């Protein structure tokens, strides 16, 4: 820890004290938090969707729409019933589902995403049940008619497939008979094969240079 940390803490607290150094370590004590104006959350209007997206600082892709999600939204035809947006981010997919009249639940493992999706729902006057959840263990079998997801394939900088594969298994459990799973992912990933093996009949709906959108039907 270098001395610049003193300056960082001093911007946010009224008093900062540093102990004597020992073995290249120091203890920093800071107290009296300053009241600072926050630039977050930030909102952005998307006229093509007639939606306002809201994001906090750690929300995936901020208040923008990534290319994979755009591909999904272009082709999404969810029908009616109950829907789950798995890994909701800034809430754009959940907002589209809710606007189309589906009873929509949105979950994410990131508290920033949960707060962003709630703010997006409020900004657009939509009723979305937004929850923090790490997976689908809290949902009973056959809970949803439709699941949408743009799943991650890395944890930090390390590629990690196990969480996504576990998510596919859980999706198969919570979907109702005849249910749909819409999944968009990087084209080089083998998720189509895994979806067919773990969930049900899977076909490619659309594909571009970077992303593949699949539709799985139970």
List where the protein language model places each region.
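C-terminal catalytic and target-recognition region of SAM-dependent MTase-like enzymes
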Residues: 182-218
């Amino acid at each position: 820890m270098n001395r610049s940390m003193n300056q960082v803490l001093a911007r946010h607290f009224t008093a900062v004290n540093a102990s004597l150094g020992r073995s290249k370590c120091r203890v920093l004590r800071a107290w009296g938090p300053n009241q600072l104006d926050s630039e977050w959350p930030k909102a952005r209007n998307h006229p093509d969707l007639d939606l306002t997206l809201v994001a906090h600082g750690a929300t995936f892709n901020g208040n923008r729409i990534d290319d994979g999600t755009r591909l999904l939204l272009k082709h999404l035809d969810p029908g009616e019933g109950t829907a789950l947006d798995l890994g909701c981010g800034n809430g754009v997919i959940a907002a589209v589902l809710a606007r189309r009249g589906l009873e929509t639940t949105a979950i994410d493992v990131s508290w920033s995403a949960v707060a962003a999706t709630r703010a997006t729902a409020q900004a657009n006057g939509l009723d979305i049940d937004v929850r923090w959840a790490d997976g689908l263990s809290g949902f009973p079998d056959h809970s949803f008619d439709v699941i949408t997801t743009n799943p991650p394939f890395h944890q930090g900088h390390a590629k990690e497939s196990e969480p996504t594969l576990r998510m596919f298994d859980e999706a198969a459990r919570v979907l109702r008979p005849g249910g749909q799973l819409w999944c968009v992912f990087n084209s080089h990933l083998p998720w189509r094969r895994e979806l067919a093996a773990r969930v049900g009949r899977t076909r490619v709906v659309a594909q571009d240079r970077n992303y593949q959108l699949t539709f799985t039907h139970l």
